[in-house]
């Protein structure tokens, strides 16, 4: 991926509380969504993989 522009990306970070978080960034750097804390990095990664797998089939539920 070197030299390639990635439009959107997930990031995994460790907070000052020692929990792991993910966030989803747009190509302009804006954080579009982020997670609650996970005690294990693998759990944060599993959540990302679940979103990547299931989001294309997710329905939009308008509650307004």
Residue ranges of predicted features:
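Short, Lys/Arg-enriched N-terminal segments with co-localized hydrophobic residues
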Residues: 1-5
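Generic structural motif recognizing short loop/turn segments at the entrances and edges of beta-strands
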Residues: 6-9, 56-58
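A structural feature that tracks compact, well-ordered secondary-structure segments
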Residues: 8-38, 43-51
């Amino acid at each position: 991926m070197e030299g390639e522009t990635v439009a959107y990306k997930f990031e995994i970070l460790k907070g000052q509380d020692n929990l792991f978080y993910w966030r989803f960034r747009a190509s302009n750097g804006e954080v579009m969504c982020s997670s609650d804390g996970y005690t294990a990095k693998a759990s944060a990664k599993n959540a990302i993989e679940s979103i990547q797998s299931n989001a294309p089939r997710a329905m939009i539920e308008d509650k307004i």
